[in-house]
Structure formats: C-alpha cells, structure tokens
Amino acid sequence: MVQVSTHSATQSIPMEGEALKNWLQTRANQIIAGDRLSKQEALALTAIEGQENIFSLCEAADRIRQACCGNTVDLCSIINIKSGSCSENCSFCSQSVHHPGQDSPIYGLKSREEIVTHAKAAADAGAKRFCLVSQGRGLKYNSPKSQEFEEILATVQEIIETAKIKPCCALGELTLPQAQALKEAGVTRYNHNLEASENFYPNVVSTHSWQDRVETVKNLKAAGIQACTGGIIGMGESWTDRIDLAFSLAELEVESVPINLLNPRSGTPLGHLPKLEPFTALKAIAIFRFILPQQILRYAGGREAVMGELQNLGLKSGINAMLIGHYLTTLGQPPQQDQAMLADLSLIGGEAPIPGEYQPQQAT
C-alpha cells in the first residue's frame, strides 16, 4: 500500500492484484467524471510492477481513452523537408552538426512539387494530417531562412488546395507574428516538443533552454494554432521527470501529445543507451492518459523499434493517435500494416477529437 494525497483526500493505493485493479477502475471513473489525478498519485502509479499489474493500469487508462476520446485513432504522416547540419546539440538527434549520426541525410529545402506529392501519398495511405518538418533552431532565428519560410507558406497553401489532407508544421522556435502567418496560410496544428521535464532538459540540450520551447508553445496557442507537444521517453530520465513533463503539458493545455520512445542512434550522445523495455513504455503511456484524459496521445518515433510485436498494446493503454509511414531519419512499417492493426482492435483510423470536442454517442 502507498499512502498518497489526492486533490480531495488522503488515501492508500494498493500496489497489486484485485485491490489495485479495483482502485484503478474507481479512479478512472472519477477522472472520466471530471476529477484530476494529483502529482503524488501519479508518482505512486510509477511503483506498479509486474505484467499483470501493469495490464490493470493499462486497462483503466484505456477506459479513460474510450470515455473521453472515443475509438477514432488520429493518423498523421511527416516529411523531413530540410535535413542535417542542425545548429542545435539535442543529444537524441542524428541531424545535429555537433554529432552527426551515421547515415543521417543532409539536404536543403525540398521542392514544393516533391512535398505536395508526398502529401497526396500520405492522404492515400489514410493519414488525415501531414507535417512539414525542418531542421534548425527555428524561424525565430531565421532557420529556415526567410525566403524558405515564404516558400513553406506557399507549399502549405498548395497542399490545402490540391491534397485531401491537413498540413501541419514543425519548424522550430517561432515568434507570435510568425505563428500568425502560419495560421493565415492554413496551418491549424504545429509540432514543438518539450522533449523532457524542465529539470532533466539540460542533460540532453544546452544550445537552447526548456523555457525557449515553452515560449513557442505559448505563441502557437496565442495565434490559435493547436499545439502538438510531447516528449521522449527513455533518455535516462527518472519517473519523476516523466511525471513532471506530463503535468507541464497539462498546464500548457496542449491538444496533441506525441510520445516518442527513444530509438538510440549510432553516433549521437545517447546512442549507447539500451532501448526502453516495452512494459515500461506501456506504464508511461497509461499514466500519461490518467494525467491527460482528453488529449490526443500519439505513438510517435520509436514505436516499431521499441514495442515490436507489442505495438498493439499501446492502443489499449491510452494511445489514440499515431504516425504512419516513415519518420525523419528512420523507417516505419507499411501503412497497410497499421490499418490492419487498428481493424484487429476495432479502432477507426481518422481524425481524433481535441480536448472538449468529443461527444459520446447517446444510446437510442
């Protein structure tokens, strides 16, 4: 038993068996009804061990997902529009000029025609959103350069006009006017991850700060663009760091939360780390769902590499979105395989609701 304080009382959490399962189901019902998990409760849940007990946690998280988000799994795809020689020193990334990873591609901005062609292919594969991702610290620092930004805006508009898919962007840090320009061009969602907790962040990046990233998220929200903001699990951070990250995302009221599972890249400072254990990843996903009941939780990088044949379990542990197709510098599995996995789980690929949008169907 672990003694914790909830938002309304002090109680004990059993750590195994039927007692744990009953506590989790009761707490899930309370969260579905509008209560919120306390940080102390969340930290207590990290002590759950053993596959059967973790399955109980995942089952309760899945009930929250069904009740608060429904059975539609948000499908998106990405394209690396400019790669390599990045000025930043993110320890997990093979595109950094400080530690270029083995076999990491280096090229300038792709042509509008090539990007639009990929957008149409992503739509044909079932993706509902298509994210244009560029290396560099960000538009705020003229990276991509200003003329490249204008070309990206024009490309976004052409995707809207010619492809049956919604364009998103991930162009690094930006100012409020730059966010407003993206909004005017038709961008409704922008990816800018916090990557880690504020406490752990200096261990993986030193060329910019965690607060720099938070400022960009706030600029996005102020411009009326949905924030697709999450992080990476498996960089050597503690469970406290993971919980702190989740609560920071809740405080920022982001709409979509990519959960990346570190796939260590040779040549990077984190390349020596072991891959995350799949059940550790499942536990993290489930706890994130308890903390973020209405957010879109997105399987992102590392899904295939870390989860392997257990990928489907994430979709029954709180996940309700995923990238399909390839990632920035690594390959993903064929979209048809993802669609088959969803069908086996009686889930529907599409566009998931953002917080406050889901309306459960009323029985007639």
From Swiss-Prot:
Residues holding [2Fe-2S] cluster: 131, 168, 228, 298
Catalytically driven reaction(s): (4R,5S)-dethiobiotin + (sulfur carrier)-SH + 2 reduced [2Fe-2S]-[ferredoxin] + 2 S-adenosyl-L-methionine = (sulfur carrier)-H + biotin + 2 5'-deoxyadenosine + 2 L-methionine + 2 oxidized [2Fe-2S]-[ferredoxin]
Enzyme class of the recorded protein, top EC level: transferase
E.C. number(s) listed in UniProt: 2.8.1.6
SUPFAM superfamilies (alphabetical): Radical SAM enzymes
Domain Radical SAM core: start-end pairs: 68-303
Cofactor entry: [4Fe-4S] cluster; [2Fe-2S] cluster
GO BP term, pick one: biotin biosynthetic process
Chain residues that bind [4Fe-4S] cluster: 86, 90, 93
A Pfam family recorded for this sequence: BATS
Keyword field: 2Fe-2S, 4Fe-4S, Biotin biosynthesis, Iron, Iron-sulfur, Metal-binding, S-adenosyl-L-methionine, Transferase
InterPro entries: Aldolase_TIM, BATS_dom, Biotin_synth/BioAB, Biotin_synthase, Elp3/MiaA/NifB-like_rSAM, rSAM
Pathway: Cofactor biosynthesis; biotin biosynthesis; biotin from 7,8-diaminononanoate: step 2/2
Record text on cofactor binding: Binds 1 [4Fe-4S] cluster. The cluster is coordinated with 3 cysteines and an exchangeable S-adenosyl-L-methionine. Binds 1 [2Fe-2S] cluster. The cluster is coordinated with 3 cysteines and 1 arginine.
GO molecular function: 2 iron, 2 sulfur cluster binding; 4 iron, 4 sulfur cluster binding; biotin synthase activity; iron ion binding
Oligomeric and partner information: Homodimer.
UniProt family annotation: Belongs to the radical SAM superfamily. Biotin synthase family.
Function of the molecule: Catalyzes the conversion of dethiobiotin (DTB) to biotin by the insertion of a sulfur atom into dethiobiotin via a radical-based mechanism.
Entry protein name: Biotin synthase
Upper classification of the organism: Bacteria, Bacillati, Cyanobacteriota, Cyanophyceae, Oscillatoriophycideae
